[in-house]
Amino acid sequence: MVIDSVARDLEGKIASGTATVAVVGLGYVGLPLALNLVRGGYSVIGLDIDREKVKALQAGRSYLRDVPAGELQASLATDRLAATSDPSALAEADAVFICVPTPFTVQKEPDTTYIARAAEDIAAHGREGQLVILRSTSYPGTTQEVVQPILERRGRRVGIDIFLAFAPERIDPGNAPLPADQIPVVVGGCEADSTRLAMLLFSRLTRRVVPVSSPAAAEMTKLLENVFRNVNIALVNQVTQLCDRMGLDVWEVIDAAETKPYGFMSFKPGLVGGHCIPVDPYYLSWKAREFDFHMDFIELAARVNDAMPYYVVNKLMTTLHDNGGSNGHERVAVLGVAFKKDVDDARHSPAIKVIELLRKRKIEVAYHDPYIPTLQVNGDLFDSEALTDELLQTADCVLILADHSCFDYELIVRKARMVFDARNGTRNVTMGREKIVRL
């Protein structure tokens, strides 16, 4: 049969490692995936609309902290990695990954514009016999409601002429507890051949591939993982605020609770940021309304976390007042504006909101972050300042918002007048603890 022939031809290329794989979107998800595919033996075409990224890759320069230049250069040396901004290169691919951003609107509704554009490029420049795998996190149904109709506009049929699946990314920027090949991959295809082909492709990249019944099941899996984290962080954030009122140290309480050998999973309080954890609850609650279902619990957790910048600023202002400040002429030095420790990404960083709120209180703000050279807050561009004695000593308070591993916390506490630590980065500092205020 023709149907079997199309799938069988693609299966042979994937199984033998002779398939050419395209990755659309070379950011925090796409670029590491492209290098993993090269290590898996595939020839890879990286596609991105950002020409500066493409030029950097072609020159062997990495723009991501998690991707060492040496690793990129080693992949280029194999002659199996190319980068381009020309979507016509998609015609050469046997499989195509979509790894583009999925932001939400100001109304906190999903924006699938980038996914749709990627699908349109594949539809226009792709061909029969391709496998398309969406990796971008979105609401359950995106693969079949957004991507599939676009791919089928030109008469190609999913499951017959082309194949389509969803496989959520599971990277943890700034933290690599496991090698990529030890992290299981969940795959849900639109039909059996799509699932089987996607599983076969991933089998060269990871030791375990987990099939689920549909793309929507795989999409829901990803949201469950991230919403689980969001909800539990919200829980501990509320406990933190109660401990504050009761005069208790929430970090002491958490450390004690962690000694229970079963039934307790430790989550740390603080600001929530990035392009997944604070966004994904809204994807899920938006989709739920289509089914006349309201995710009250999840929405409440999201609101709790969204309000944490206000809590941090209010507590900081109280601390300044209690220490003789709060006269409208204070200077705060913010350390770390990335959305989490050890990453070079400020998208959806809670530090932006904190700085905005401080400036509304007439606080002069300077920041230092070795990974974020510039930061835009309400249209104003800030430059990262050097971490000097002057920066620390002239600030009324040093505010730690991202506890980067490279920071010398002993030095920071020694030089600063006061330290407000929103991340518990100073937990191992022994001298000068009377200067430290924690959540």
Language model feature labels by segment:
Residues 1-439:
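Structural/interface elements that position substrates and couple domains in central-metabolism enzymes
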